[in-house]
Structures are given as structure tokens and as C-alpha cells.
Amino acid sequence: MQTEHVILLNAQGVPTGTLEKYAAHTADTLLHLAFSSWLFNAKGQLLVTRRALSKKAWPGVWTNSVCGHPQMGESNEDAVIRRCRFELGVEITAPEPVYPDFRYRATDPNGIVENEVCPVFAARTTSALQINDDEVMDYQWCDLADVLRGIDATPWAFSPWMVMQAANSEARKLLSAFAQHN
């Protein structure tokens, strides 16, 4: 895969340029565009993944299915599809927005900052997983209700963006409806 970049944004969310992805994530990360996705199988189970230990930010942490950064000229939906193929080797249905205006800033224990405008999508897998070990070290298919209870009881066990997304009542409602629509 070619070197990825992030699309830098001003405070109003307007693109101002690009920066190489690895260089972008530091203790002083600039605001940039990202996406987050929650993938469900035909049984309505959520794919929860554990980030590879080689990841720069939040290595080894459990999180929602796939996250990433759209490239210049690429739609968020196309970026979700691209990263699902790269990280999980999986095909998905068209991603549907569940929390389009999600924005967050969080600092991991090593001081790496995420500072993102990060629309959240849900999609259904349509093929078997073929995990990329450089991205994902473990995964589990879970009932969404169990995952949400786990997040509520032990938020420290999950990525901060997953916890913040799950805390939004409208996103939670849309994810629950998505999981129930088999």
C-alpha cells in the first residue's frame, strides 16, 4: 500500500492541506479528517478488533471494527471500503452514516494525540475475514448489547473514540437498529 496522508482541517472543518499519516500523529496532532466504522455480520453481531501492538497510537487496545483516513479526492464511504479490504480482507455493504458529526481529541498513554473530525459509519460484511496482522492482533464477533454494556462498565478497556461514539444516544440507537436488521 502506498504512503497514506491525512487531510488537515481548520477549526471549521475546511481542508487546508495534507500531511503524511505517520508524521501527523504526535503529541501535537493537528486537526484532520478520519472515519470510524462498526461492521456487523449477517447474524447482527458486531466485529470488535484489537489494534496490533505495532500501531503508533493505542497499540493492543480493543476498538470498533475499522478506522482510517480518507485520502485526497476519496469519499469517506470509499475510504471505509478501502480500509476494510486492507485491514480485514473483507467486502462490505455500502457504509451508512450513524454519527456524521463526531469529532474528538484524545491522548494515549504514550502521549500520542488523536485530533479528528471522524464521521462514524455502519456496514455489513459480505465475505469472510482475512485479517492483516500488521493492523489487527485479535478480533471477536459480539452481540452489540454486550459490547455496549462492556463499554459502560469498563470504558478503560476500549479505545476512547469507541467509548465516545457509544456514549452518543442517537448513534447508539442507529447502531442497535442496524444490528437488528438482518
Curated annotation (Swiss-Prot):
Domain Nudix hydrolase: 30-164
Involved pathway(s): Isoprenoid biosynthesis; dimethylallyl diphosphate biosynthesis; dimethylallyl diphosphate from isopentenyl diphosphate: step 1/1
InterPro entries recorded: Idi_bact (IPR056375), IsopentenylPP_isomerase_typ1 (IPR011876), NUDIX_hydrolase-like_dom_sf (IPR015797), NUDIX_hydrolase_dom (IPR000086)
Recorded GO CC terms: cytoplasm
Domain of life (superkingdom): Bacteria
Principal place of residence: cytoplasm
Pfam families cross-referenced by the UniProt entry: NUDIX
Cofactor binding, per record: Binds 1 Mg(2+) ion per subunit. The magnesium ion binds only when substrate is bound. Binds 1 Mn(2+) ion per subunit.
A GO BP entry: dimethylallyl diphosphate biosynthetic process
Catalytic activity annotation: isopentenyl diphosphate = dimethylallyl diphosphate
Cellular location(s): Cytoplasm
Keyword field: Cytoplasm, Isomerase, Isoprene biosynthesis, Magnesium, Manganese, Metal-binding
Active-site residue numbers: C67, E116
EC nos: 5.3.3.2
Cofactor: Mg(2+); Mn(2+)
Residues binding Mn(2+): H25, H32, H69, E114, E116
Residues at which Mg(2+) binds: E87
GO molecular function per UniProt: isopentenyl-diphosphate delta-isomerase activity; metal ion binding
Keyword Magnesium in annotation: yes
Quaternary structure and interacting proteins, as annotated: Homodimer.
Record's function text: Catalyzes the 1,3-allylic rearrangement of the homoallylic substrate isopentenyl (IPP) to its highly electrophilic allylic isomer, dimethylallyl diphosphate (DMAPP).
UniProt-listed NCBIfam families: IPP_isom_1, PRK03759.1
Similarity annotation: Belongs to the IPP isomerase type 1 family.
PANTHER family: ISOPENTENYL-DIPHOSPHATE DELTA-ISOMERASE
Protein name, per record: Isopentenyl-diphosphate Delta-isomerase
Organism from which the protein derives: Escherichia coli O17:K52:H18 (strain UMN026 / ExPEC)
